[in-house]
């Protein structure tokens, strides 16, 4: 009936209201192409109509907030795009939110098997709205009071160098900790999210996590008291190593 559907509840409601429950016409987007087809419904013993479609209208995940601009309250997180695992496509965000969360445990990384942060989030603690999901991270507006934390100057790409640095991340509860890393290589490829190759040489972090784990994406990389980038990927064959994106790329994307 030419009604736009934005969630599963709307879809089920319209199916119940339609007169012809044998076949319904639907229009959908695949990439940039619009398609129309007929959908055959099946009625269960409980008088519930099934479409045979796999449909979901939301996705959740654990990641790390990289920065908040104190002047504009724009924020950036993750340092890479969110991919829908079933389609392999970048997820289009229309009404995203970031929430306060607490790390409850760590599944350690091992060679060939990345670990992850286990966390719980409080849906009543909305910290901001997400408006963009890009190759450089997710971006939006921080809507609560900015925490009274240390401000970092931003390093230019040409000032990032190999050698000592650190990452800021949470591995227990809400406590932000600094862990030592060593930057091995710099890649100035303009389109890459792997500008910085580093290894962890912090014994505590290696002991507790086995290296980089999922959920650390977005963790700020600090060098000489400047923010230089954010963690983006783990080296699967050696989880003590990881990649990061230049912070300047994330800031440029946020401003756009």
Where is each model-derived feature located?
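Conserved PDZ fold ligand-binding element
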Residues: 1-9, 221-224, 228-229
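PDZ domains, with a preference for the canonical peptide-binding region formed by the helix
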Residues: 2-27, 238-240, 244-249
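Short, surface-exposed secondary-structure boundary micro-motifs
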Residues: 2-3, 29, 170, 232-233
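PDZ-domain C-terminal substructure recognizer with occasional recognition of PDZ-binding tails
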Residues: 12-51
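Short loop/turn microsegments at loop-to-beta-strand junctions
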Residues: 216-218
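Short, solvent-exposed mixed-charge patches
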Residues: 255-256
């Amino acid at each position: 009936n030419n009604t736009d559907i934005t969630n599963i509840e709307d879809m089920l409601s319209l199916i119940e209201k339609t007169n012809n429950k044998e076949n319904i016409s639907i229009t959908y987007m695949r990439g940039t192409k619009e398609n129309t087809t007929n959908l055959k419904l099946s009625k269960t013993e409980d008088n519930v109509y099934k479409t045979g479609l796999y449909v979901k209208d939301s996705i959740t995940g654990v990641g790390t907030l990289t920065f908040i601009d104190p002047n504009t309250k724009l924020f950036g997180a993750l340092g890479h795009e969110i991919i829908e695992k079933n389609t392999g496509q970048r997820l289009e965000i229309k009404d995203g939110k970031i929430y306060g969360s607490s790390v409850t445990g760590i599944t350690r990384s091992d060679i060939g098997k990345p670990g992850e942060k286990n966390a719980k989030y409080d849906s009543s603690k909305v910290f901001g709205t997400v408006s963009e999901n890009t190759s450089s991270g997710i971006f939006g507006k921080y809507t609560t009071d900015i925490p009274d934390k240390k401000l970092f100057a931003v390093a230019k790409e040409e000032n990032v160098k190999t050698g000592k640095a650190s990452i800021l991340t949470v591995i227990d509860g809400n406590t932000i900790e600094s862990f030592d890393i060593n930057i091995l290589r710099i890649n100035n490829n303009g389109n890459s999210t792997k500008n910085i190759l580093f290894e962890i040489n912090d014994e505590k972090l290696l002991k507790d996590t086995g290296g980089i784990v999922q959920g650390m994406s977005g963790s700020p990389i600090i060098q000489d008291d400047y923010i230089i980038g954010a963690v983006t990927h783990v080296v699967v064959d050696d989880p003590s190593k990881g990649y990061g994106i230049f912070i300047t790329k994330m800031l440029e994307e946020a401003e756009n």
